[in-house]
């Protein structure tokens, strides 16, 4: 009996990997343009880290984390998101002492025990970025500009930027009170999850996708009406900077985030292409998180993108693997040995070279070269070995010409690099 993979944890097959690598490669390129440096953190952290950062009453902590005790009875958790581990590393290694402004990015797998569906999996991958040490609204705008730049670079244009402000410790309690007062008379219209959220995390009721809950909250008070003057000014400046950069955005006062650490600016990149999983990137400011985790009182802002959702959005634009530069078709044992050694030398010159390893007919080898979409085929047999000249076929136009075996590596290098 064969062993299958774990539900909601998917294999990334070679036919898809090129698209994944393209998305990752563009993240490296774009983020470095904005002064961000990559950081890599473990996939397992102490459970306490996520309880203190994400919030003990969030859906993630209450229902979705993969948590276990190790053999020393330490409670550990597979990371459900990337910001908290990056902040833990930032504090532990005192990165603020090296530079008062830290701009970091990461990529890798995250884990949540959820019902698998399109765009939502139990192991999923994120690309994220964090800017620490600056509370200026201009930094919010730069992070959003970088995110928009990335989407342009990877060719995903059917997205909209939604922005909101969740206020701060001074004004959010007033909004929470206004919202719970509004919801109190409508509790019977809320789903079971939202009735629980009413007690623990009422802002999350606004994010519920259940139609009855959306109807019940359609006239709920707006957080933007209860911002303190500082948060109101901050949000106004963020919007002004976005306008200066000619970045389109939509104010979405109902947009809340599922993690407790967010303050002030929050945002999402949304699409209508993925059904209910309409956010392909999301983030916000978290000015109290680092202090909450035992570090200095430093502000921060960041975001994460779901790579699986980006891949889905690429759709028909899937990135194709690079074609082989040369396919070596050999007939006979001596020619096969010569081709094998030549293939290695070509690969050492950074040429993509392939050959058939089982003694197939020339016709079969040509079919293989065609399937691989090789640019050239080098045909080598006993006659070619004796004459010192092989045959080189251009697979794009069908032309064929002799090519000397002496110095063939340099000749093929010039030939392929010239096309």
UniProtKB/Swiss-Prot annotation:
| Enzyme Commission code | 6.1.1.21
> What's one Pfam family here?
HGTP_anticodon
Q: Which CDD domains match?
A: HisRS-like_core, HisRS_anticodon
User: Known catalysed reaction(s)?
Assistant: tRNA(His) + L-histidine + ATP = L-histidyl-tRNA(His) + AMP + diphosphate + H(+)
State the source organism's domain of life: Bacteria
Q: What is its subcellular localisation?
A: Cytoplasm
InterPro entries cross-referenced by the UniProt entry: aa-tRNA-synth_II, aa-tRNA-synth_II/BPL/LPL, Anticodon-bd, Anticodon-bd_dom_sf, His-tRNA-ligase, HisRS-like_core, HisRS/HisZ, HisRS_anticodon
Q: Does the keyword Protein biosynthesis apply?
A: yes
Which stretches are transmembrane?
none
- One of the record's GO cellular component terms: cytoplasm
Alphabetic keyword roster: Aminoacyl-tRNA synthetase, ATP-binding, Cytoplasm, Ligase, Nucleotide-binding, Protein biosynthesis
Q: Which GO terms describe its biological process?
A: histidyl-tRNA aminoacylation
A single MF term (Gene Ontology): ATP binding
Q: Which HAMAP family match?
A: His_tRNA_synth
Describe the family membership recorded for this protein in Swiss-Prot or TrEMBL.
Belongs to the class-II aminoacyl-tRNA synthetase family.
Quaternary arrangement and interactors, per the entry?
Homodimer.
Specify the protein name.
Histidine--tRNA ligase
Originating organism? Syntrophotalea carbinolica (strain DSM 2380 / NBRC 103641 / GraBd1) (Pelobacter carbinolicus)
The major lineage groups are:
Bacteria, Pseudomonadati, Thermodesulfobacteriota, Desulfuromonadia, Desulfuromonadales
The gene it comes from is hisS
């Amino acid at each position: 009996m064969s062993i299958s993979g774990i539900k909601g944890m998917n294999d990334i097959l070679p036919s898809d990997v090129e698209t994944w690598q393209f998305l990752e490669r563009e993240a490296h390129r774009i983020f470095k343009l904005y002064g961000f440096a990559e950081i890599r953190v473990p996939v397992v952290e102490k459970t306490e880290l996520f309880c203190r950062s994400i919030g003990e009453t969030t859906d993630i902590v209450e229902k979705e984390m993969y948590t276990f005790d190790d053999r020393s009875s330490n409670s550990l958790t597979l990371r459900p998101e990337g910001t908290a581990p990056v902040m833990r590393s930032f504090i532990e290694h005192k990165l603020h002492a090296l530079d008062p402004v830290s701009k970091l990015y990461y990529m890798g797998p995250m884990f949540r025990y959820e019902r698998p569906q399109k765009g939502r999996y139990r192991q999923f991958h994120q690309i994220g970025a964090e800017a620490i040490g600056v509370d200026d609204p201009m930094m919010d705008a730069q992070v959003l500009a970088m995110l928009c730049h990335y989407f342009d670079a990877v060719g995903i244009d059917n997205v909209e930027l939604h922005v909101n402000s969740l206020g701060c410790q001074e004004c959010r309690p007033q909004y929470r009170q206004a919202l719970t007062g509004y919801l109190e008379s409508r509790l019977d219209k809320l789903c079971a999850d939202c009735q629980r959220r009413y007690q623990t995390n009422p802002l999350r009721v606004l994010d519920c996708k259940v139609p009855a809950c959306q109807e019940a909250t359609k006239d709920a008070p707006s957080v933007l009406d209860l911002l303190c003057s500082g948060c109101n000014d901050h949000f106004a400046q963020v919007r002004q900077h976005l306008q200066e950069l000619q970045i389109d955005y939509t104010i979405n006062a109902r947009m809340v985030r599922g993690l407790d650490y967010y303050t002030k600016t929050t945002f999402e990149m949304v699409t209508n292409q993925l059904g209910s999983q309409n956010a392909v990137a999301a983030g916000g400011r978290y000015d109290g998180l680092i202090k909450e985790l035992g570090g200095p009182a430093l502000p921060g802002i960041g975001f994460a993108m779901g790579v699986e959702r980006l891949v889905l959005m690429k759709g028909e634009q899937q990135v194709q693997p690079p074609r082989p530069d040369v396919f070596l078709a050999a007939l006979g044992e001596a020619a096969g040995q010569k081709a094998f050694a030549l293939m290695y030398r070509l690969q050492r010159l950074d040429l993509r070279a392939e050959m058939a390893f089982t003694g197939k007919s020339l016709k079969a080898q040509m079919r293989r070269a065609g399937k691989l979409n090789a640019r050239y085929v080098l045909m080598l047999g006993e006659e070619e070995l004796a004459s010192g000249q092989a045959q080189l076929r251009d697979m794009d136009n069908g032309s064929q010409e002799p090519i000397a075996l002496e110095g063939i590596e340099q000749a093929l290098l010039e030939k392929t690099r010239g096309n």
